[in-house]
Amino acid sequence: DGECIFGQHSAAQTHLEGQGVGLGDVFVFFGLFAEEETGEPHHRIFGYLRVEEMIPLAGGAPADLVALRHPHALAMHSANDVIWRGEGRTAKRAGESLRLTVPGGPPSLWKRPEWLKRGGLSYHDREDRWLHGKRLRSVARGQEFVADIGRRQAPREWLARVIDEIKAS
């Protein structure tokens, strides 16, 4: 229906708070997939959420989220359990532009947009992660990587293309 409801808690939520993630920001979700023809594992972007509302659950979950049976609304996972809510969708098909893993590479070896440089993605500060040829060796664990794009035009255009691809699928 065009709405995304995402729950987060514990260290991951603390990281998001520490990075200043909030209203108006956009989550870009990725996961591990397998190519249909070859079974090749790879990371791929599969959805997004434009944050319109942040709902701390420490004071109780809103009735509409309980009625939807959202896992974070049914039972608190930790003291800092939060629901992130807003416009969002998942991709219906796997367009090549949403693939993160370089062709033929291990899942953790990503192609990266030109605008994304060392120091621009949380958890990826080590120099050896930023490789020639616009590649990034992604950390093996984690899911909340924050890129503060500010008002820069190139990352905003990249994000718009990703969202357009998801909506068009």
What are these regions (language model features)?
Residues 1-42:
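Short N-terminal edge-element motif at the start of the domain
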Residues 13, 33, 48, 110-113:
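Generic detector of bulky aromatic hydrophobic side chains
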Residues 38-55:
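Short beta-strand-centered aromatic/proline hotspots
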Residues 54-169:
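Contiguous surface segments at macromolecular interaction interfaces
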